[in-house]
Amino acid sequence: MSQTAAHLMERILQPAPEPFALLYRPESSGPGLLDVLIGEMSEPQVLADIDLPATSIGAPRLDVLALIPYRQIAERGFEAVDDESPLLAMNITEQQSISIERLLGMLPNVPIQLNSERFDLSDASYAEIVSQVIANEIGSGEGANFVIKRTFLAEISEYGPASALSFFRHLLEREKGAYWTFIIHTGSRTFVGASPERHISIKDGLSVMNPISGTYRYPPAGPNLSEVMDFLADRKEADELYMVVDEELKMMARICEDGGHVLGPYLKEMAHLAHTEYFIEGKTHRDVREILRETLFAPTVTGSPLESACRVIQRYEPQGRAYYSGMAALIGSDGKGGRSLDSAILIRTADIDNSGEVRISVGSTIVRHSDPMTEAAESRAKATGLISALKNQAPSRFGNHLQVRAALASRNAYVSDFWLMDSQQREQIQADFSGRQVLIVDAEDTFTSMIAKQLRALGLVVTVCSFSDEYSFEGYDLVIMGPGPGNPSEVQQPKINHLHVAIRSLLSQQRPFLAVCLSHQVLSLCLGLELQRKAIPNQGVQKQIDLFGNVERVGFYNTFAAQSSSDRLDIDGIGTVEISRDSETGEVHALRGPSFASMQFHAESLLTQEGPRIIADLLRHALIHTPVENNASAAGR
């Protein structure tokens, strides 16, 4: 027989409670209500092994609460330190809802004494790591942004379950704007947190991700409108958000039939700081465990491109991440025969063992123009909501202020309409490529998933493969050589060597193709252009350029750039190549030649205002300027 919420709380308040969770999820369960859960713990090896009961028709229910450690990203084939933190699954045996008011009347409120408070890395040590990442990783083209953690450590005197429940009570009373505020006790450890960020949720087949980035740290007296407006006008903060939106659009493009539809931006206000955020929605019918695997992990707490970020994290965090940047995922049955999913990223979370040792890991997004000491201060501020006494009064809030709303709306003035459209609007894009087959070769950057969505909107039939797969150009009308991290001159690297060989083959066979970013750089080298490392990398930068006579706003993510002093080259064995370039610096933006085109920027990015049109124009050029016999053989399959 199901027990009442009061009976479940009696069991939770015991000196040695069984595994339990109290979850405040106002966007899912409704404001003022918490989930009270009791269950049995298991340790599946992989996400696919999480045991789920059959769905049913009737009342919705919650089945499993999973705690997914960072090391689980190895399921995607990405590098990670194996710190042996287990994947934990609470099979829910009892569940009820309870109001905040009633719960607060039951929760203990004992004093919490912290001893031996310290960070594992000092501000100076953390700032030095930030400097190394900017110089050695972003500066070498490994990626656009990376998140490196540091950890606050302390011991709670006379620790017991009442200490953790009191800690949770304080967060519940004071923290504002969290997506989940929670306590999860597994038997051997307890997680207490106020995560601002949804990982992914699914209801009635609609999946939602919530990229959050940019941080305004409140001054001691609390936030004020002038500083909020300065924060919203800060290009660095805007760039950080655009980059993580691009990265989560890549994920949504992989799991959703129509890709993602972007909503926002908005101001997310919490007790001690504020962020900016977007929402991305898309329809999906895939197994929730598969969706969790495909979205390991959020770029807001790792970096981008994700695979490259994992390598960087492994280099700079040799001790592992445990559950920091992982997720808590709540899987259920929606009562209609389908699955429900809600999940929060495990940030702003205290990991407490049964002896009372507390670990709170935090990180900062490092981009090309990060100031190391500022990033150290930001990481410290992110821990403040958990380790400080919290303020007696809620801070002033400005999210609905007219000036703030106008400033937020202005951020969408020059970004891609495509990703702001819903799927029905995308179907109205002119599809004059209907039925043509295109092969996309992925070079370790899932921007290719976003390229695929735009190409399908143009009417193309798309196949995506990795550069490391066995594949053939035969049978395709077009080939797109994709972007990726790395130095295009390092031909001793297997991926770079493969791109050189593949692009030379496309040129010699005069097959129509488009090269993007890294592949554009390889093409430039194959055509004899000089390549230079940029003094300041373009990582998530929107620029206005002259693209073969048209003024375009486009998004760049590059450390290297081809150079040319001319707008046109005549190349033996190739023919005439047109060059779109910066007339002052000679930096090459794009190329057009017989049977091919290329672009240094990312037309698929949120930062490129007219991406599908630009891609369509370049593909038309490649097809139109391909010898008749090649077009005929492709079209006549």
From Swiss-Prot:
Pathway: Antibiotic biosynthesis; phenazine biosynthesis. The active site is at C517, H602, E604. Residues 437-628 form the Glutamine amidotransferase type-1 domain. Its EC number is 4.1.3.27. This is Anthranilate synthase, phenazine specific. It catalyses: chorismate + L-glutamine = anthranilate + pyruvate + L-glutamate + H(+). GO terms for molecular function: anthranilate synthase activity; transferase activity. The gene is phzB. One of its GO terms (biological process) is L-tryptophan biosynthetic process. It comes from Pseudomonas chlororaphis. Involved in the biosynthesis of the antibiotic, phenazine, a nitrogen-containing heterocyclic molecule having important roles in virulence, competition and biological control. Component I catalyzes the formation of anthranilate using ammonia rather than glutamine, whereas component II provides glutamine amidotransferase activity. Residues 1-434 are annotated as: Anthranilate synthase component I. Keywords: Antibiotic biosynthesis, Glutamine amidotransferase, Lyase, Transferase, Virulence.
